[in-house]
Amino acid sequence: MAGQEQQQPQSRDSQVDEDIPEAPPAPPEAQASASTEGVDDLLDEIDGVLESNAEEFVRAFVQKGGQ
């Protein structure tokens, strides 16, 4: 056995997969700002609803004596 050479398996890291698609290009700035404005409007609406619900909750809590 001393005269036999052992073959080592090749590492998979040395092989490059060419089937991996490239990332899509970044969206234009106009689309990004339009999307951001829509999200901002939605967050403002949610904030308003939460504020009105919080006021009602506090009133109901105080009327019940905090129980």
From Swiss-Prot:
One of its GO terms (molecular function) is protein tag activity. InterPro entries: Ubiquitin-like_Pup. Keywords: Isopeptide bond, Ubl conjugation pathway. Residues 25-61 are annotated as: ARC ATPase binding. The modification Deamidated glutamine is found at Q67. The keyword Metal-binding does not apply. Belongs to the prokaryotic ubiquitin-like protein family. This is Prokaryotic ubiquitin-like protein Pup.
